[in-house]
């Protein structure tokens, strides 16, 4: 009936499908998280691809270009403002960059469609689509570059039960699952009147597979909660702060009143007001911008070292007996690093992780060597140098730690006083005697947490992480939708690894999830100032299948499906 009014080859029909993908995407992602919206987006994609198969490949690519911009404006409309604030460009450049971003970030549709087109599936009622469509979509998710990555698997966030499949196949496995569910739905709709047909029976078999995956999700949600190590539980008490300070633009770097107000706010929030002190204090990215705590000649020369910032970190640890996780900038052989640092109360030493995945045009300027004039356009862009290796941060929980006030709170800008106290041999010996356990943190700085590959490489070594901590600064984007989309994408890392995940954002949303991706606290909302004190269990029994094998099996499976189909198509064409 629908096709009596709108032709499958018409511009209107294709525009409706493009908007169907865009609207389905925005409502499939957080904060809406409608599972049906994700299915709607993928079904719209199927029908768009079939419509494009009836035109030339160049016209099809033109439509995919249109799709990329429709997706931009429906789901990621916050990007132009973010570009302007992060890099300091004017409105014209930010809009121009927005269009370019849409093309680059949605290149996966070009690969997705190309693989689908050459698979020669001429109808949504063909059972080949059950595997070809998911394999092509998943492979394009895994291969193509994205700036702020979103995957088809992110659109399944409306079902916490289906999301548990990520513990086996990761977010890419969820991409395959969503596209498989959508394909199965289409076959069922087409053949539900023909129950004796081969196609209907195939769709029922697919439905049984989906039911098994759902059953696994239910089992995992119940099993994880009962599989904690009760003999030697490792409970870590944490204080997380969200100061909601304004973005540290370069013109504020020399503003003493701004820096003083920012540091005071962080300091006042991080001093616990309850009797039981935390074992770990988590301070988000850029809570204290521009500065670091390494008192080196090059840091002093570039005015990066801040004695007050170091004094605050030392004071907090001394006052609470806690380790302190925070973000800082430091020069290392003339290379400016963006770091996650852990100050350890046990010995007064600091471990540091250098951020490996930098934000283009925000933290570094691509092609700056070839086009130096870009620096005059993107004036707020930083000059960070990426780290080379993953690094776990090892903290310690010490028994019988009591909160007390160190002397001379007025001397925060003279950290030597506090440094001396941490060097006491007697105190250090007592702490070692009272050491309850050590714990390992997998640090993720800002949008690094959106890339599953950056998490997987931590599981290749003997020492495994026990908790994931993502400290981030979303204040640059000034968009509640972005904050929710970012947070929703990060949550999957907890399910993939089977570990609790703490997300501490300077302006929101700050959340904590257990190994199933289920919230453990009431989140601190967007542009709220607040703290959360909570306890997490660190005694995961075993690694997930995904952390042991990664994406290897999914790569092989998808490639074999597509190669088999292409061989089959080429044989048919040769015979004809």
UniProtKB/Swiss-Prot annotation:
PROSITE patterns: CN_HYDROLASE. Its main location: membrane. The chain crosses the membrane at residues 15-35, 38-58, 60-80, 92-112, 128-148, 168-188, 204-224, 549-569. The active site is at residues 285, 355, 446. Keywords: Acyltransferase, Cell inner membrane, Cell membrane, Membrane, Transferase, Transmembrane, Transmembrane helix. GO terms for biological process: lipoprotein biosynthetic process. Residues 236-538 form the CN hydrolase domain. Pathway: Protein modification; lipoprotein biosynthesis (N-acyl transfer). This is Apolipoprotein N-acyltransferase 1. It comes from Leptospira interrogans serogroup Icterohaemorrhagiae serovar Lai (strain 56601).
């Amino acid at each position: 009936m629908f096709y009596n009014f709108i032709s499958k080859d018409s511009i209107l029909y294709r525009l409706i499908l493009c908007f169907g993908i865009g609207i389905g995407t925005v409502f499939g992602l957080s904060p809406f998280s409608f599972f049906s919206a994700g299915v709607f987006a993928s079904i719209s994609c199927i029908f768009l691809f079939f419509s494009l198969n009836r035109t030339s490949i160049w016209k099809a690519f033109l439509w995919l270009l249109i799709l990329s911009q429709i997706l931009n404006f429906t789901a990621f409309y916050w990007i132009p403002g973010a570009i302007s604030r992060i890099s300091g460009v004017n409105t014209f450049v930010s809009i121009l960059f927005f269009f370019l971003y849409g093309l680059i970030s949605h290149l996966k549709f070009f690969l997705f469609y190309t693989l689908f087109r050459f698979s020669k599936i001429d109808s949504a009622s063909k059972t080949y689509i059950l595997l070809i469509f998911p394999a092509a979509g998943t492979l394009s998710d895994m291969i193509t570059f994205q700036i702020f990555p979103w995957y088809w698997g992110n659109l399944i966030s409306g079902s916490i039960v289906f999301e548990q499949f990520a513990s086996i196949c990761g977010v890419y496995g969820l991409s395959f699952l969503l596209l498989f569910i959508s394909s199965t739905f289409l076959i069922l709709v087409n053949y539900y009147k023909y129950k004796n047909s081969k196609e209907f029976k195939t769709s029922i078999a697919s439905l049984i597979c989906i039911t098994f995956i759902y059953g696994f999700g239910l089992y995992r949600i119940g099993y994880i909660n009962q599989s904690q190590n009760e003999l030697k539980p490792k409970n870590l008490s944490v204080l997380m702060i969200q100061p909601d300070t304004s973005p540290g633009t370069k013109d504020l770097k020399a503003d003493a009143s701004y820096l003083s107000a920012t540091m005071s706010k962080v300091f006042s929030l991080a001093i616990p007001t309850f009797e039981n002190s935390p074992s770990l204090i988590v301070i988000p990215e850029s809570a204290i911008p521009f500065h670091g705590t390494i008192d080196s000649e090059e840091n002093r020369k570039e005015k990066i070292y801040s004695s007050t910032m170091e004094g605050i970190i030392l004071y907090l640890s001394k006052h609470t007996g806690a380790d302190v996780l925070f973000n800082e900038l430091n020069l290392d052989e003339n290379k400016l690093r963006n770091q996650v640092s852990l100050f350890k109360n046990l010995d007064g030493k600091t471990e540091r992780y250098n951020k490996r995945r930098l934000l283009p045009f925000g933290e570094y300027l691509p092609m700056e060597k070839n086009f130096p004039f870009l620096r005059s356009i993107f004036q707020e862009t930083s000059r960070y140098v990426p780290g080379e290796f993953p690094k776990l941060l090892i903290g310690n929980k010490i028994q019988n730690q009591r909160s007390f006030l160190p002397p001379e709170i007025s001397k925060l800008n003279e950290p030597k006083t506090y440094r001396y106290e941490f060097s006491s041999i007697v105190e250090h010996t007592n702490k070692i005697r009272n050491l309850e356990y050590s714990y390992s943190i997998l640090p993720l700085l800002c949008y690094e947490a959106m890339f599953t590959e950056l998490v997987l490489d931590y599981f290749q070594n003997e020492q495994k992480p026990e908790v994931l901590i993502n400290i981030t600064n979303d204040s640059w984007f000034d968009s509640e939708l972005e904050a929710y989309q970012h947070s929703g994408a990060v949550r999957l890392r907890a399910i993939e690894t089977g570990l609790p995940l703490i997300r501490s954002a300077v302006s929101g949303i700050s959340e904590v999830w257990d190994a199933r991706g289920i919230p453990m606290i009431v989140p601190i909302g967007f542009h709220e100032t607040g703290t959360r004190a909570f306890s997490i269990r660190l005694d995961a029994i075993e690694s997930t299948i995904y952390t042991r094998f990664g994406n290897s099996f999914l790569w092989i499976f998808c490639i074999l499906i597509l190669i088999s189909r292409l061989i089959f198509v080429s044989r048919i064409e040769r015979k004809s």
